[in-house]
Amino acid sequence: MQLMKSSYLELTARGHVTDLLKPDDTLEMLETYGFAVTQSPVEAVSTAHAYREIAAIREDFGLGEPYVPLLYRDRDEPTVTAVTRKGGSDHPVFHTGEAQGWHTDGLLEDIGTIKTTLLYCVSPAHRGGRTFLLNAGRVFEELRMEDPEAADVLLRDTILGRRSTIPGVDREAVGPVFLELGDGHYATRYGEGRVERWYPADAAEQHALDRALRFFRARRDDPDVRIDLLLRAGQCLIFRNDVLAHGRENFTDDPQRPRLLLRSLHTNAPKKPS
């Protein structure tokens, strides 16, 4: 990957949508920017067609079968999740139109477990529903240069707990916010939303943590390290969940055609099959 040197500002002129039938172009985008958006060649996309295209993407990039997160293992959840409004659901975000703060997928998983997320848009919202991506590792590297003490707190393996907000599910996973990888990049589980619980060891560490989080809040709206994507019908967002953080703005549905995205999670990183 080249994420530590990449700027999302480069995509203003270049664009970020690739042809579903040109996987080499898509893989180059993923290697450079950590994400890609494929465009279906089909004009009117059905849910059945979306599932077929997701299967083709999995095969093209060696992703393997979808991974079911630990949080949902006992809930009889499908391997590919329908992210849409649904009455009676106990999930605080999936089946509502509410915004979702910065996070990585895999609430209870060890850092870096879920490497790839696919989000396929069958039908967009009437208004809103953008997905945000943050080059979290690059921001962290900047923090290490500016305030090493604050950065070191985010590497501590008991600093961040992520706790389920699903009613009746009292589970939490504790770990670091960042983990150094061998290729000069960082795995991340950065987030600031409803599920995070912070565990600084003492007052000095609390001050360092506060500085680190302020740094991220100041940087995460910069289009150099953040990109906002509004998926259209037939587009599939592929991104490196282990190195990028993501979020979602709230949305309003067309009652006749509500927003529907299909989400597929994978423990493999995209690669060119041998």
UniProtKB/Swiss-Prot annotation:
Which EC number applies? 1.14.11.49
Q: Which residues bind Fe cation?
A: 103, 105, 246
Q: Which InterPro entries match?
A: AlphaKG_dependent_hydroxylases (IPR050411), TauD-like_sf (IPR042098), TauD/TfdA-like (IPR003819)
Q: What chemistry does it catalyse, as a reaction equation?
A: UMP + 2-oxoglutarate + O2 = uridine-5'-aldehyde + succinate + phosphate + CO2
Q: How is its activity regulated?
A: Inhibited by several divalent cations, including Zn(2+).
The prosthetic group or cofactor this protein requires is: Fe(2+)
The protein's matches in SUPFAM superfamilies, at most eight in alphabetical order, are given as:
Clavaminate synthase-like (SSF51197)
Swiss-Prot/TrEMBL GO biological process terms: antibiotic biosynthetic process
Its annotated pathway? Antibiotic biosynthesis
The entry's keywords: Antibiotic biosynthesis, Dioxygenase, Iron, Metal-binding, Oxidoreductase
Say yes or no: keyword Oxidoreductase present.
yes
- A GO molecular-function descriptor: metal ion binding
The question of whether Oxidoreductase is a record keyword is answered with: yes
Name of this protein: Uridine-5'-phosphate dioxygenase
Q: What organism does the record attribute this protein to?
A: Streptomyces sp
